[in-house]
Amino acid sequence: MFDTVLVANRGEIAVRVIRTLRRLGIRSVAVYSDPDVDARHVLEADAAVRLGPAPARESYLDIGKVLDAAARTGAQAIHPGYGFLAENADFAAACERARVVFLGPPARAIEVMGDKIAAKNAVAAFDVPVVPGVARAGLTDDALVTAAAEVGYPVLIKPSAGGGGKGMRLVQDPARLPEALVSARREAMSSFGDDTLFLERFVLRPRHIEVQVLADAHGNVVHLGERECSLQRRHQKVIEEAPSPLLDPQTRERIGVAACNTARCVDYVGAGTVEFIVSAQRPDEFFFMEMNTRLQVEHPVTEAITGLDLVEWQLRVGAGEKLGFAQNDIELRGHAIEARVYAEDPAREFLPTGGRVLAVFEPAGPGVRVDSSLLGGTVVGSDYDPLLTKVIAHGADREEALDRLDQALARTAVLGVQTNVEFLRFLLADERVRVGDLDTAVLDERSADFTARPAPDDVLAAGGLYRQWALARRAQGDLWAAPSGWRGGGHMAPVRTAMRTPLRSETVSVWGPPESAQVQVGDGEIDCASVQVTREQMSVTISGLRRDYRWAEADRHLWIADERGTWHLREAEEHKIHRAVGARPAEVVSPMPGSVIAVQVESGSQISAGDVVVVVEAMKMEHSLEAPVSGRVQVLVSVGDQVKVEQVLARIKD
C-alpha cells in the first residue's frame, strides 16, 4: 500500500478522499489554487502545495504543476477525484511516465470511453445493447440528415466528445434537424474542441440508470448494483438513489452483466460507472449510453447499500491488490438516496449564487452522511462548480430513506449563501418522486411549480428582536444608549427596522428591552416577546410560543434558519427607507457572482430599456443584463472585473 497520496482535486470530493486516506494511515497531500488557500481540503490534508491562480487551466488542470507537486511531496499515487483531470488520458499517461500511480483506469480505457462513437462500437462487440443510431467518425450534416430517416424520429444529436449535456439536441421534426446540427456542432467545438456528432433514437420517457463496477489488474470485475439518476436538471444530476425502484431482480442481473462486459472490453482497472438509458415504459429494455472512467459524485449511495469504501478499493487496486470479494459476495442492503446542495437560487431560474459562508449547519444521526467542502468563512465564488455539499440518507427501505433525507435537509443550513435546499425538499415531497415514477423530465416539469417560501411573521419578528438585542449589546450598559423605547413625556416609542427579504419586506416595530419586549410586524397585532441569543442559536418567544433559530449576521445582513427553511433578511433603519422617489437612478445589478466579459454600452450614452448593458459569466454560463429603463447610463465596471452577487454594475438616470 502507498504511504503518500496526492489528491488532485478540491471541494467535497477532496475532503472525502482525504477522510479515507486518514483512516488507512496514508499521508495525504492537497493541491490548491489561490482562492482555495484556506479551503477545507487544504486544512485537512497532511501537506498542501499551491498550484497557481484561480483559473483551472493555470492550476487544477495544469498537468505539469500537479506532477511537480507529487514529486516535491514524495507522493506515490494521485487520486484525481472527479472533474478536472479525472478523465484526461494525457494525464493518466503522464503519471505512468513519471512513475506515479494514477488511481484510475489505463489511458487507453479513458481514450476509448471518452470518444462516444468508439465507446459504442467497443461495447457492441461485447454484446452490450446500444441505442439504435448512427455512430461513425467524419459524418457530415448531410449524412446525418439521411441517417436520421433510417434511425427514426425523435432523434438525439450527441457530441462524440465531452458530456454534461453540452452539444446535445432533441429533434422531433425532420425540418428542424439541419439547424439543430449546426447549433450542436458550434457548441461542441466551443466546449470540447471537437465538433464530431452522432445520432441516437430518443428513448421515450427515458430513465438514467447507471451501474457501479470495480475491476482489478488480475482480470476480476464485479458490479455493485445500480443507481437511479433520473432526477436531473439540464442533464445535471440533482438527486440519486440506489437501488433503482424501477428494475426487477432479473433486469438488475442482466444490466450488471452488461456493465461488467463494458469494463472488460477496454481492460478496465479501478472504479467506474456504466450509464444506461432505460425507458420507463419498457423497464426490461436498456441501452448503453456511456462509461464514466472515474469515481462518480453519487458514489456514496452505493457505499451505503454495499458497506464498501470505494476510495479504499481504488487505492487497493491501484497498489496491485486483487479484489477481496466475488460477485456472489456482494449483498445490497436497504436503500440510499443522495441530494446535492448547490449554490444556486431555484426561484431565479437556478442562477448561480455565492458569497462568504457565515455559518454552516450539517445534519447527523442514524443513516445520515454528509460529504461537504464547507467551513465557516468559506468563500463561494464563480471559478468552480457550485456543488457545496451532498446529504445522503440510508434506510431499511426507500420510504425510510426518503423520510430520513427530508429530515436531514431540514437540519441543513448554509448561512451567507443562497442554496437549493428548499427546492430539494419540494422535490422529495412530490408524489411521483415518492412512488418512484421517474424519468429525466420530471425535475424540469416540477421546477415550474416551485415557489420559494416567503419569510413568515415569526422570522421577521425574530429579525426585529435580534436588532433590538444587538443595539442593547452595543450599548454595553449605557442606560441612555440602550433601546428601552422610553422618551421624555413618559411614552414609549418603538425601534423600527425595515426587514427586506427577496419575497417580502415589512417594517418590524419593537418596544422595550430584548428580554421583555413587544413586537409588531407591519400593521399586525402587537405581541409580547423576548429573545435570547447565543453564538449559534436565537430563541424567540412570542405570545408564549418559543421557536429556536440558527442565525448569522454580517454587515446588516441577517440569515435565519429553522426546519422550515433559510431566510436572508437585509436590515435598513426606518429613516433610510423614505427617500425622494424620483431622485434615485435605476440600477443594473448582478444576480450572481462572476466575471464581466463584455460591456455593451459606453458610459454617459443614452440607452433604451431592454438594451444589454453588461454580460457576466458565472459557472461557464453567460448572462446578459439589460437596462430596466431608458436613460443616460453610468457604467461602474470594466471587462475582466470580478463582481459579487447584488453588486451594482451600472446606474441609469432619466
Curated annotation (Swiss-Prot):
Residues annotated for Mg(2+) 1 binding in this entry: 275, 290
Pathway where it operates: Amino-acid degradation; L-leucine degradation
Domain Biotin carboxylation: 1-448
Domain ATP-grasp: 120-319
Binding site for ATP: 148-209
Gene Ontology cellular component annotations, sorted alphabetically: plasma membrane
One example GO MF annotation: metal ion binding
SUPFAM superfamilies in the record: Glutathione synthetase ATP-binding domain-like (SSF56059), PreATP-grasp domain (SSF52440), Rudiment single hybrid motif (SSF51246), Single hybrid motif (SSF51230)
Binding of Mn(2+) 1, residues: 275, 290
Domain Biotinyl-binding, chain residue ranges per copy: 578-653
Annotated Mg(2+) 2 binding sites: 290, 292
Protein name per the record: Biotin-dependent 3-methylcrotonyl-coenzyme A carboxylase alpha1 subunit
